[in-house]
């Protein structure tokens, strides 16, 4: 019993002597790990163990056992994604515009061994790499591209960081440019450019409105002219139809009159009546000539009405003989 108590006391002393806080060089230490026999590794952490000063193994989350005298927890790596603020720095674009930029870098450890032995201070190294990469990428483009294609710029920075930080066991998930400052003169020039662009758009909209109004007026005038011409055409057609119908009616009336005259001539005494009518019209025609101031050649026997009637009858007889 005494021997057992003595062994327990020695073991307790040994455990107390091995629970000294560990000086972890990584700044992503979740808590102070202790060199004990029984160790509980939290989730999303990796403990790097050295045995007699040489890398031994990496403790996975859960229950782990170590030998406190010869084993030592050297590094505690946080496997969760973390955000690092990138300090403000200067950069010059390809068109010689000086900018002041800062950002946020999101990264995680994917290889605890490389993160522990590949670089002394991973966070500091990645921060410096992000700054130099951002200056390099900004120097390849002009100011307008920096504003228009910021997402592409972020992607290029992430690609360059991952390419350089692969031996460190660190992966850059994304990079975001947070703030961007430029000289006051450049800001004033950009403001003037914005105002000019607004005025240009306003002028374009106004000219388009004037053009649309002119087109609408022209379309209205065109339709009005078409309607007016159609109205004139319809009026002329109606007048022509009226005149044609009048001519047809006159011709039909004339034909009916001639037909009746022909029927009358076939009756007894019709020829004498027709001759008398012709003689009357003949004499009347000469009477009308006397009313006008025209120069005409008259027959010599104009003063003899009987001879004029005889001439009229002779004309009628000659016409009648021709028909026969």
UniProtKB/Swiss-Prot annotation:
Signal peptide interval: none
Alphabetic keyword roster: Mitochondrion
Alphabetized Gene3D superfamilies for the sequence: Band 7 domain (3.30.479.30)
Record carries keyword Glycoprotein: no
Inducers of expression: Induced by anoxia. Induced by paraquat, a chemical causing production of reactive oxygen species (ROS).
Localization per record: Mitochondrion
Cellular component annotations (GO), alphabetically ordered: membrane raft; mitochondrion
Tissue specificity: Widely expressed in most tissues, including body wall muscles, intestinal epithelia, and pharynx and head neurons.
One GO BP annotation of this record: mitochondrion organization
Pfam families per the UniProt record, alphabetical: Band_7, Band_7_C
Top-level taxonomic group: Eukaryota
Function: Mitochondrial protein that probably regulates the biogenesis and the activity of mitochondria. In neurons, involved in mitochondrial fusion and recovery of normal locomotory behavior during reoxygenation; probably acts independently of egl-9 and the canonical hypoxia response pathway.
Family: Belongs to the band 7/mec-2 family.
Protein name: Stomatin-like protein stl-1
Organism in which the protein naturally occurs: Caenorhabditis elegans
